[in-house]
Each structure stands twice: as structure tokens, then as C-alpha cells.
Amino acid sequence: MSDLRKIIGLSSVLAVGFMLVILSCALFKNWYPLLIVIPFILAPLPNLLTKKYSTSHDFLQEEDRNLLDFGRFTFGATICTGFALPIVFVNVGLIGTAAATMSCVGGSIIFLVITLYSQAFVQHEEEF
């Protein structure tokens, strides 16, 4: 598949994700669901940064492994925050269940597109 088709496909799916989030805000006249997107957008950053700064490929080096583990932990905590925030908002009464569901699905789609883009277009350096 050509790169142009990948970009067009990913951008159309990304537009659907943002549309769901915007609709969850606009239909119910409450803009709190827009805050739910922030953890989903920030979620890939810890893995990208820790992989970039982890330079050693020696499996015996513990420092780089700790850095990668910290990145994975931060990634997991951010994703859990993205799903827990709407639940908290619903329990407090800030948003409705439908708005929380739409914003979670939209945020998940946005996160999926960011992850797929990084997998498809980031060049992996191979050392021999």
C-alpha cells in the first residue's frame, strides 16, 4: 500500500475520532468530554521518548531497561487515566453516559491512529 493511501486512510479515521469527541461535547452542550482526549493524545509520548533516549542494545544493561519500564508504566497510567476520567465525570454528574461513551470511543480511535501512524512511518534503525 502506498504512503499516500495510508495517510489518507489514517486521516479519515482520525477525523471520525475527533468528530465523535466534538459531537459528545456539542450534542449534550457540555464541553467537559473534550478533556478526555488529552490523555489519549499524550499516551504515545512516554514510549517514544524513552525508546529514543534508550541507546544501548545490551540486554545486560539495567539502566536502559529501567528507562523503558518507566516509559511503559507512564504509558499505561496515561491510558488508564483516559478511560477513568469519563467514569469519574459520569459519577460526579458532570457528563452523561452517552457523552462519556462517545468521548471514550473517539479518544480510543485517536490513540489508535497515532499508534498506527508511528508504526507505519517511523523508520527503525537496524544495526548489524
Swiss-Prot record:
Cytoplasmic compartment segments: 1-6, 51-72, 122-128
Keyword Protein transport: yes
Compartments, record wording: Endosome membrane; Golgi apparatus membrane
Pfam families from the UniProt entry: Vps55 (PF04133)
Any one GO cellular component localisation term in the record: Vps55/Vps68 complex
Listed InterPro entries: Vps55/LEPROT
Membrane topology of this protein: Multi-pass membrane protein
Residue ranges annotated as Lumenal topological domain: 28-29, 96-98
Keywords noted in UniProt: Endosome, Golgi apparatus, Membrane, Protein transport, Transmembrane, Transmembrane helix, Transport
GO biological process assignments: late endosome to vacuole transport via multivesicular body sorting pathway; protein transport
Transmembrane regions: 7-27, 30-50, 73-95, 99-121
Top-rank lineage group of the source organism: Eukaryota
Function: Involved in protein transport from endosomes to the vacuole.
Similarity section: Belongs to the OB-RGRP/VPS55 family.
PANTHER family hit by this protein: LEPTIN RECEPTOR-RELATED, RH04491P
Protein name: Vacuolar protein sorting-associated protein 55
Organism: Schizosaccharomyces pombe (strain 972 / ATCC 24843)
